[in-house]
A protein has these predicted regions:
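Inter-domain helical "communication" segments and dimerization helices
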Residues: 1-87, 96-97, 172-178
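DNA major-groove recognition helices of helix-turn-helix
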Residues: 9, 112, 129
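Juxtamembrane/interfacial segments around transmembrane helices
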Residues: 55-62, 102, 106, 128-129
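Short amphipathic helical patch at the helix-1/turn junction of helix-turn-helix
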Residues: 85-86, 133-137
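Basic/polar phosphate-binding segments, predominantly the helix-turn-helix DNA-binding elements
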Residues: 88-124, 138, 144-169
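Short, basic, alpha-helical segments at the C-terminal edge of helix-turn-helix-like DNA-binding modules
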Residues: 121-130, 169-178
Length: 178
């Protein structure tokens, strides 16, 4: 049946994403969403375009989250960071999770990614903040808390460093584009 074929494709794409060294957290979320959608379909027309959308979503997943070019230590560090991004994440915690010393992690991370651990963390947090600011009306301080930065002034300063505008100005620009 069409459902069985799509469920098989979903499983194959999931396996390919694992081979591309994408964190299981991301893979399983996409896999589960497609499985629920396929299994919940009542009519054949409910499944139109699902195969194409699956290919697109899994390709984007690999494109944005593949860690295939990194050593296992850096993969472990990035996976830990991504899983704890909205908490107070310290270099010591990350190094412990990867089973290496702080100095080794810092040097290796910089060598393999081209940025420091904190630059990576802050970049990811600012990316999340941009999403919140673009689609919600949350107060700026709350957005900062949501991304793991409890100090509103520090959040604004960091956001301005990365985006060349304040969070409030960014939100206004995004609202003007709607």
């Amino acid at each position: 049946s069409v459902k069985d074929m799509l469920l098989s494709e979903n499983t194959l794409y999931r396996e390919a994403a694992y081979r591309a060294a994408v964190h299981p957290m991301y893979i399983e979320w996409v896999f589960r969403k497609f499985s629920e959608r396929i299994e919940g379909a009542v009519f054949l027309k409910d499944l139109e375009g699902v195969a194409r959308e699956m290919i697109r979503r899994y390709c984007l997943l690999v494109q944005h989250h593949s860690l295939a070019g990194y050593s296992q230590v850096i993969r472990d560090a990035i996976n830990y960071i991504d899983s704890h991004l909205h908490e107070a994440v310290g270099l010591k915690d990350i190094a412990e999770s990867a089973g290496v010393s702080v100095s080794y992690l810092a040097a290796r991370f910089k060598r393999e990614t081209g940025q420091s651990v904190m630059e990576y963390i802050n970049g990811k947090r600012i990316l999340d903040a941009r999403r919140y600011l673009a689609v919600t009306d949350m107060p700026v301080a709350v957005v900062g808390e949501q991304i793991g930065i409890g100090n509103g002034n520090y959040f604004t300063k960091l956001f301005k460093k990365y985006e060349k505008c304040t969070p409030r100005e960014y939100r206004e620009m995004m609202q003007a584009k709607r």
